[in-house]
Design a protein with these regions (language model features):
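Conserved Class I SAM-dependent methyltransferase catalytic core
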Residues: 16, 23, 32-33, 37-45, ...
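Active-site lining segments that contact anionic ligands and/or coordinate catalytic metals
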Residues: 277-278, 300, 312-314, 328-332, ...
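Non-catalytic, mostly N-terminal accessory regions of nucleic-acid modification and defense proteins
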Residues: 1-199, 261-272, 365-368, 386, ...
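Conserved S-adenosyl-L-methionine
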Residues: 178-283, 288-292, 297-304, 315, ...
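Accessory, often C-terminal, charged low-complexity segments
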Residues: 287-309, 314, 352-356, 389-393, ...
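Active-site proximal loops enriched in glycine and acidic residues that flank catalytic Cys/His/Asp
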Residues: 208, 237, 264, 285, ...
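Switch/connector loops and helix/strand junctions flanking conserved nucleotide-binding motifs
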Residues: 243, 269-272, 288-291, 341-344, ...
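Short, contiguous acidic/charged loop-to-helix segments that flank catalytic cores in large enzymes
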Residues: 27, 292-312, 338-347, 367-373, ...
């Protein structure tokens, strides 16, 4: 009797889409191609939203009776971008097979910016460049044209928003080290947001990259039956290209990005939100940044706990975040793990002052390989302006340490992600610890609530491993599982080596000897 065939697991829709789009990339660098693809996804989103509202205005029923479908104010009133005729998706699709399609798309982007001042200098105009084959661009337009089946704006925004976010992550992986400069891994953002729980208030990210922290904050509120309108976001980004991605990423989610600012001087030299006092700060600043213009800011009023060294911005960022917190505000951010132990150039003294001031709430040691742009070990800091209440129990004189180095799983030989279970485990530990009736327990090898006296004993070093100790049980080592993991990693390395050797050989064959 023939064995029944196992059902073939269908590949996720966004993964299929990514493979198809990547195939059309040909010889274009991933860093450039992402603007081409993401710009088109954005254009499809605003065109779908526009067409849906326009059909209601044309029907002229109920509240839309007597409305003019060509009146820009009608669209503005419902937070929908006005899309002129030459920029509508139907027009692009009708012209997708023409050799002039690149020029048509660039003109569409220009027209949208003219009619929507909030998008001025945001959209990419890169489609008529010589390295983008018109046939491939037409294929990409057809591909993206099939993303949102059905015309409901909410469905379209949800699907297109998800695809946009997925593609951001895939482009970051494709770019490797450079990709990490505009993208914080999704699982890290989810962990920060799940721990901070920004249900209501002002959320600030002064180094916002492509806006992932904001998108996740809004998602968090929606998933917990909160009201999205109770959150307002403020951000700043010094890289204009990345800022453009952030503006599109937020617009496709219908999130107001009017307070997400760009200037090339950055948050330290040109703080775009000088007077802002936020309820939440959530950020992933550049690790160990040595080029932050610290020599120009020696007497800055933000350095309340000590002047940070000019050669490393870690403790400048910490104090910048604290400066922007309101009296009951909470900050959660990523830093290089060295920030927990460093004593060079006065950093140890600043850390001591922060601890003695009762500002450090929780430290999380992260697994390796989570970040695309660096192999530097990372950690999360959580700081609270008021540990005595703020809706939680009095935690004055305590710091929670979580060692999450063993969490997460590999998705390829270079990259790891935290699963939903990992995120929940870490976040729940923090919540149980800080809540009034939380059933928190120290777990050897994972978490420990340490007294300020204990931190003093260890000379203000904040490495979680120093506090949590070794796990009670070391005998649950699974040899088969570990062997299989190592074998898979080794096979991936061999494949990558084979690919690189073939590429080198191909390039050598192109060299013509005179």
């Amino acid at each position: 009797m023939a064995k029944a065939k196992k059902p073939v697991k269908e590949e996720p829709f966004e993964n299929q889409l990514w493979k198809a789009a990547d195939k059309l990339r040909k010889n274009i660098d991933a860093a450039e191609y992402k603007h081409i693809v993401l710009g088109l996804i954005f254009l499809k989103y605003i065109s779908d939203a526009f067409e849906e509202l326009r059909s209601k205005l044309l029907a002229g029923e109920g509240e839309y009776e007597g409305a003019d479908p060509e009146d820009k104010d009608e669209y503005k009133a419902e937070n929908v971008f006005f899309v002129p005729e030459i920029a509508r998706w139907s027009h692009l699709q009708n012209n997708a097979k023409l050799p002039t399609i690149g020029k048509t798309v660039d003109e569409a982007m220009d027209a949208i910016e003219r009619d929507n001042p909030s998008l001025k200098n945001v959209l990419p105009k890169v489609y008529a460049r010589g390295n983008l084959d018109p046939t491939n661009l037409g294929g990409l337009i057809d591909l993206i044209g099939n993303i949102a089946f059905g015309d409901a704006k909410s469905r379209s925004a949800d699907i297109l928003g998800h695809v946009f976010e997925y593609f951001l992550g895939e482009f970051a992986l494709a770019e490797g080290k450079k990709g990490g400069q505009f993208y914080t891994p999704r699982s890290v953002v989810e962990l920060l947001v799940e721990m901070l729980q920004p249900y209501k208030g002002r959320v600030f990210d002064p180094c916002c990259g492509s806006g992932g922290m904001f998108v996740q904050s809004e998602k968090f509120v929606e998933e917990h039956q909160g009201r999205v309108n109770d959150i307002s976001i403020y951000g700043q980004e010094s890289n204009q290209t990345t800022w453009r991605l952030a503006k599109m990423n937020l617009a496709i989610r219908g999130i107001d990005s009017s307070q997400v600012k760009w200037n090339n001087e950055g948050s330290f030299l040109n703080d775009a939100h000088k007077d802002l006092k936020a309820d939440f700060v959530i950020a992933n600043p550049p690790f160990n940044d040595s080029d932050w213009s610290g020599d120009l800011l020696r007497q800055d009023g933000r350095w309340k706990y000590g002047t940070p060294p000019t050669g490393n911005a870690n403790y400048a960022w910490i104090q910048h975040f604290l400066y922007h917190l309101n009296p009951k505000g909470i900050a959660g951010f990523v830093l290089a793990k060295g920030s927990l132990t460093s004593k060079t150039s006065g950093e140890g003294n600043i850390r001591k002052e922060l601890i003695e001031a009762g500002l450090v709430d929780c430290i999380v040691n992260l697994p390796a390989k989570l970040f695309l742009n660096t192999q530097i070990p990372a950690c999360l800091w959580f700081m609270s302006r008021d540990k005595t209440n703020g809706g939680f129990r009095d935690r004055k004189g305590e710091i929670l340490f979580i060692d999450a180095r063993n969490e997460g799983h590999l998705i390829n030989r270079r990259s790891k992600v935290l699963s939903e279970e990992d995120i929940q485990k870490i976040a729940d530990t923090y919540h149980k610890w800080r809540e009034v009736d939380g059933e928190y327990e120290n777990i050897k090898g994972f978490c420990n609530s340490a007294s300020l006296d204990r931190v003093r004993e260890l000379d203000y070093v904040l490495t979680p491993g120093r506090y949590v100790g070794l796990p009670d049980e070391e005998d649950d080592f699974d040899f088969n599982e570990r062997f299989t993991t190592l074998k898979d990693e080794f096979e991936e390395q061999l494949k990558e080596e084979e690919r690189l050797n073939a590429l080198i050989l191909e390039n050598l064959n192109k060299v013509k000897l005179v």
